[in-house]
Amino acid sequence: MYAIIETGGKQLKVEEGQEIYIEKLDANEGDTVTFDKVLFVGGETVKIGNPTVEGATVTARVQKHGRQKKIIVFKYKAKKNYRRKQGHRQPYTKVVIEKINA
C-alpha cells in the first residue's frame, strides 16, 4: 500500500517503512506526526481525493533534524566590480513512515 501526501508545499509518494526527507517540521526527535493531506491511496483498492481523501491519514515518526548541503548564490556584473556571495543551507526533517490509514 502506498499514498501520496502533501507536506511543505511538495507532494511525495510514501510507503510504510520508508525514510523520507521533508521540509523542517516543528516537532522533536522521536515524536509521532500525522499527515492529514492525503491526496491518493493505492494498493488493492484505489482512493482518489478531491482534493484529499476523507478519513485517510499517514503516521510517521521523526528520526532527526538537519541541514542540507550548502549552496552558493553568486551575483556579479561584468566590468563593474560588483560581486555578492551568499550561502544557504535548507533545514530538513527525516521521518520514517509507520502506518497508512485509509
Swiss-Prot record:
Part of the 50S ribosomal subunit. Contacts protein L20. The keyword Ribosomal protein applies. It comes from the Bacteria. This is Large ribosomal subunit protein bL21. GO terms for molecular function: rRNA binding; structural constituent of ribosome. Signal peptide: none annotated. GO terms for cellular component: cytoplasm; ribonucleoprotein complex; ribosome. Keywords: Ribonucleoprotein, Ribosomal protein, RNA-binding, rRNA-binding. Disulfide bonds: none annotated. It comes from Geobacillus kaustophilus (strain HTA426). It holds the Pfam family Ribosomal_L21p. One of its GO terms (biological process) is translation. Belongs to the bacterial ribosomal protein bL21 family. This protein binds to 23S rRNA in the presence of protein L20. NCBIfam families: L21.
